[in-house]
Amino acid sequence: MLFRSLVCLPNGAPKCEVCPLAAQCKGRAAGRAEQLPVKTAKPEKTLVPVTAALITGPQGVLLQRRPSKGLLAGLWQPLAFEGTAMTQPELDAALRAIGLCVQWQAPLQSTRHVFTHRIWQISGFCGTAAGPAPEGCVWASRAELNGEYAVPSAFAGIMRQWRPE
């Protein structure tokens, strides 16, 4: 345990009288003990646009697995493109490039998820598709979502918009 967390209090009077290092303390010698420790300012959170595609079909909802390293590593999510706010035609072109032909229905209601260092502003579109899932994706039923596929809470607002037929 760090004794300084109990002695050098950032928002209170320091307890120099019980500190075993008081004789060597440069802050106390300079008369600055009440101003220490100096708290560093938290960095600004970066706003990151994310475009999601909530694609449903006869087998359920289409999910893709996130990369094995990084934010939300290995979890499942609806198809999503981090770092870009895409229009429906741009999203359609990106999905056609991976072999997915989508019948678009409506825009998704935007959601926001706050992480410690970034804020995801998630928007997108919902639609239907059929056929095999593209590489790296699976079709998941609602029952499978409750047990087999872990979807991060960042996408909870998007997933709530899934209305299975």
Predicted features, each with a name:
Residues 3-165:
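Intrinsically disordered, low-complexity, charged terminal extensions of DNA damage-control enzymes
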